[in-house]
């Protein structure tokens, strides 16, 4: 475990909140913030649907049906990143035709100080319920130390866990994409779109 590293533990389905706080190493994101962002996204989409003559949405797809429970959509997390002047600079996902593409893409990954890379967010399948009819997803952060050693900072774990060097990071990301249908989001400073 990494001494002095900020680490939030899982509460309800707030893994997106914990991931943001673990990524930025401070407790700035809250369930109230994420609820507000989810409502704003819902209102924007409802207005666009109304303008285009599409039917009304009755349920907010950006969060849990139950208020304050969490289970926030990736779009809520992406909007929250903007509040910290950050964006996703790379998004990688498993491709069965190229099973090692994610690992290969990250083999020469450079996240040394000065590159603007804050860390990585993983969104992976967490549970498959009802015989695979329903799956839930879980977010967690991966952050570099000042010595370019990478750590998993997952709210479901008792504390931060070391991954190792960039080559070990590439293997970890490839495994997450391959085995857990993980989406890999590289978070960088500044504005931009993937």
Pin down the residues of each PLM region.
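Conserved beta-strand elements of beta-rich interaction domains across eukaryotes
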Residues: 12, 20-22, 95, 125-127, ...
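Noncatalytic regulatory segments and standalone regulatory/sensor domains
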Residues: 149-194
């Amino acid at each position: 475990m990494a001494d002095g590293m900020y680490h939030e533990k899982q509460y309800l389905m707030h893994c997106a909140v914990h991931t943001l706080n673990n990524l930025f190493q401070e407790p700035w994101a809250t369930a109230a913030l994420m609820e507000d962002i989810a409502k704003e996204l819902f209102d924007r989409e409802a207005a666009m649907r109304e303008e285009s003559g599409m039917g009304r949405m009755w349920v907010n797809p950006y969060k849990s049906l139950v208020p304050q429970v969490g289970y926030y959509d990736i779009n809520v997390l992406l909007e929250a990143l903007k509040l910290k002047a950050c964006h996703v600079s790379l998004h990688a996902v498993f491709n069965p035709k190229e099973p090692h593409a994610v690992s290969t893409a990250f083999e020469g990954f450079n996240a040394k100080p000065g590159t603007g890379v804050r860390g990585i967010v993983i969104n992976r399948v967490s549970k498959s319920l009802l015989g695979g009819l329903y799956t839930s997803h879980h977010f967690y952060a991966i952050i570099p130390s000042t010595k370019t050693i990478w750590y998993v900072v997952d709210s479901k774990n008792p504390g931060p866990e070391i991954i190792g060097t960039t080559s070990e990071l590439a293997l970890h990301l490839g495994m997450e994409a391959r085995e857990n249908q993980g989406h890999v989001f590289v978070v960088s400073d500044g504005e931009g779109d993937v």
